[in-house]
Structures are given as C-alpha cells and as structure tokens.
Amino acid sequence: MSRHEGVSCDACLKGNFRGRRYKCLICYDYDLCASCYESGATTTRHTTEHPMQCILTRVDFDLYYGGEAFSVEQPQSFTCPYCGKMGYTETSLQEHVTSEHAETSTEVICPICAALPGGDPNHVTDDFAAHLTLEHRAPRDLDESSGVRHVRRMFHPGRGLGGPRARRTNMHFTSSSTGGLSSSQSSSYSPSNREAMDPIAELLSQLSGVRRSAGGQLNSSGPSASQLQQLQMQLQLERQQAQAARQQLETARNATRQRSNPSNISASIPPPSTATNTAMTESNPLASHSSQFLLTRLNEPKMSEAERQALESERADRSLFVQELLLSTLMREESSSSDEDERRDFADFGAMGCVDIMPLDVALESLNLKESSTGKEPPPPPL
C-alpha cells in the first residue's frame, strides 16, 4: 500500500496522499501530510505544540528499512500524548506514562491504536495509563517462537516540543475497553496477516460511511417525497374546483341565454339525426299555429247555447255601433271641410265688391228684425 487510503489532509485537503502521515494526539480526527506538517500548518484548534504520531505506509517502510525484521525487544516509535516525547515502545510508553503522568486526566488519543492496523484511529481516553494497562500490555512469555514483529511505524526525528497544552472541551471519546489490539495478539500476527487486515478495516469503514450517507439521503428525501405528494393532492383539488366553477358558469350562461332567446332552444340542442330533423321541421309550423290559440281556448269559459247567442248579438251590436261612429265622423269631416270652402268663396266675392243675393225669406226676416228694433228704441234726448 503506497497511499493512506480513506485519509485526507486537514490543511491542504488532499485525499489518499502518499508519504508520511502525522496524526495529532490532541485534536480529534486531525491529520496532516508531510509537507503541511513540515511547513507548520495550524488552525484555531491545532497548534504546532500538539504531539503528533508519525505513520508510514507499507511501501515507505520497506523503502526506509529494507524489509528488516525487528524483534519485540527492539525499539518502536510511539509518541507520548502528554509531553510529546518520541521513540517509545508499547512497554516503555506504559512505564513512562505511569511514572510521569499518573495523575494527568487530560483527554488524549491513543497513539498505539492510531498506528496499528485495524485499530481505532480516533480512540479518545481520559485515563491513558489504564487504557495502556488493559489494552496494550504484552506478556513476553506468551510470544510466538518466532518472536518477530514487522514494524510498520517509525519515529520522525527533529520533532520539537514546548509550552503547556490546553485541555480540550469538545472531544468525543469512547469508554470501550476493546478499542485497540493487545500486543500479544498483534505480535502473533505475521506480516502477511497484518497486511490483510488493512483492506478489511478500510472496507468496513467505507461500508459504514456509505450506509450512513445512504440513511441520511433517505431521511432527507423522505420529507421531500411527502411534500411532493401533498403538492400533487393540492393541485388536483384546485383543478377539480376550477372545473366545477367553470361548469357552474356555463350552466348559468346557458340558462340566461335560454331565458332571453327562447326561440334558440331548439338550435342549442344538437339534433340526433337527419330524419328527426325533417320530422321536427314539418311539425313545427303546426305546433306554432296551434299554440297561438292554446291559451285562448283554455281561458274561454264554458257557456250554454243561449249565452253564446247573446254574446254574439252583443258583439254584432258593438261592431255596428263602431261602424256607424266611424261613418259619422267621416261625414262630419267632409261637411266641415265643404262649409269652410264656401266661406272662403263668399269672402272672396265680397272683397270683389259684389253683393250676394239673399233668399226672400231671409230678407223678410231681416227686415222684421230691423223694424222691431227701431220701434222699441227710446227717443233721443232733447238738445
């Protein structure tokens, strides 16, 4: 393995990088590549004073050590997470912690669990000495006859340390006692078994990450699917309401049209066939002619023969009276027009200086009237 699979640098964000990997033993899940570590990359939570554990890939270890085999008694490079000193083996690291940092309760990450294949790279504990005693104590008499361990991690010289360390407040840790592998178990594994453990652990971690991401996607897509269903239901209801309103408007319009134009009722109804059309056109005149007298017939009261004869005589008298009245009015108009013509002619004749000849009886009457008027007049008064 020439890459750190599944690991990314928190400074340059390079994933699956090559070369040395430096893991912070104070910050949770914080890794740096060799270039960022040497350049002194820092963040708000990570400083250059934090102790780091150097982790090598298989290819880099073979390149540096040439495939040499180291026994259990020979030194291995682990870093103390409290003081930052390097070059400890599992046994020497435990002795150093119990003697120097027995009363320290700062939460740190176990460098052995982070460096060993198959271990928890982010195992946080606030009792590091007890963790080493329970998980990484290796009795020497239980080792295999070969007594050989293929060291994969190395100590990086030139690592400085200085200044106090602040206690971390936002730290996630597990109190499980099975987080790491014991030295007896790890020492019994051959190099081939250790090499086979790395891809299995990586596959398990990848599968767990895929399951979590899939679960998050399902949870996030659940509400969206329900919201889409609700929107579809609302759209269907709105469409149904709009169709019902349109139907009501159409029926109201048809009713008003039928009331305003009753003759268009037959035109608005579609004809079923041509034969029925011809039959309706033939029967329409008769129906209209008979419908004219329908109301009159219904309104006529039932009368006897004598009543009918009396009614007919009254109607005849009324008609005669109306005829005579019309004739008399016409005759009066003609006579009045002739009298007016005669008067006009007499006025014209008098204007010409002619005297009209009066009849004899008219002249006598006018004379008698004059005599009577002269006889009855009083005598004129004396002068």
From Swiss-Prot:
EC class name: transferase
Entry binding sites for Zn(2+) 2: 24, 27, 46, 50
Coiled-coil ranges per UniProt: 224-261
Residues annotated to bind Zn(2+) 1: 9, 12, 33, 36
Zn finger limits (ZZ-type): 4-60
Places the protein is found: Cytoplasm; Late endosome; Lysosome
Polar residues: bias regions: 280-289
Low complexity biased stretches: 175-192, 260-279
Pathway terms, separated by semicolons: Protein modification; protein ubiquitination
Highest taxon above the source species: Eukaryota
Molecular-function GO terms, alphabetical: transferase activity; zinc ion binding
SMART domains noted in UniProt: ZnF_C2H2 (SM00355), ZnF_ZZ (SM00291)
Keywords (A to Z) from UniProt: Coiled coil, Cytoplasm, Endosome, Lysosome, Metal-binding, Transferase, Ubl conjugation pathway, Zinc, Zinc-finger
GO biological process, one term: protein K63-linked ubiquitination
Gene3D superfamilies for the chain: 3.30.60.90
Family: Belongs to the KCMF1 family.
Function of the molecule: E3 ubiquitin-protein ligase which accepts ubiquitin from an E2 ubiquitin-conjugating enzyme and then transfers it to targeted substrates, promoting their degradation by the proteasome. Together with UBR4, component of the N-end rule pathway: ubiquitinates proteins bearing specific N-terminal residues that are destabilizing according to the N-end rule, leading to their degradation. Does not ubiquitinate proteins that are acetylated at the N-terminus.
Subunit structure: Component of the SIFI complex, composed of kcmf1, ubr4 and calmodulin.
Protein's name in the database: E3 ubiquitin-protein ligase KCMF1
Organism of this sequence: Danio rerio
Biological classification of the source: Eukaryota, Metazoa, Chordata, Craniata, Vertebrata
